Amino acid sequence: MSRSIKKGPFIDDHLMKKTLKAKEGKDNRPIKTWSRRSTILPEMIGFTYNVHNGRVFIPVYITENHVGYKLGEFAPTRTFKGHKGSVQKKIGK
C-alpha cells in the first residue's frame, strides 16, 4: 500500500537540512546518510549521497529518474553469489 497523498513524501529532517545546506553552500562533497527510508525529492537532484547498506556506504548520484524512489533502493543490502550449479559427473573409462 502506498503512502497517502495528503501526508506527502517522507524525508528525515536531518537529511533535508544537510541537502539545503549543501545547496546554498555549493558544496560538492557527498552527503553521508543512514536514512534509507527517505524519499528522493527534486531538491536532491545533482547531489551524491553515501547510503549505508549495513556494512559500507554506497555512493548514489541522484538524477531526474530517481525522483520518487527511496534512497535504500539504490544500495543493495544482500550479496547474491549465485545459485548452486549442477555437479558435473565425470565419466572416466
UniProtKB/Swiss-Prot annotation:
InterPro entries: Ribosomal_uS19, Ribosomal_uS19_bac-type, Ribosomal_uS19_CS, Ribosomal_uS19_SF. SUPFAM superfamilies: Ribosomal protein S19. The keyword Ribosomal protein applies. Keywords: Ribonucleoprotein, Ribosomal protein, RNA-binding, rRNA-binding. GO terms for molecular function: rRNA binding; structural constituent of ribosome. Signal peptide: none annotated. Pfam families: Ribosomal_S19. GO terms for cellular component: cytoplasm; small ribosomal subunit. It comes from the Bacteria. Gene3D superfamilies: 30s Ribosomal Protein S19, Chain A (3.30.860.10). GO terms for biological process: ribosomal small subunit assembly; translation. Protein S19 forms a complex with S13 that binds strongly to the 16S ribosomal RNA. Belongs to the universal ribosomal protein uS19 family. This is Small ribosomal subunit protein uS19. It comes from Helicobacter pylori (strain ATCC 700392 / 26695) (Campylobacter pylori). The lineage of its organism: Bacteria, Pseudomonadati, Campylobacterota, Epsilonproteobacteria, Campylobacterales. The gene is rpsS.
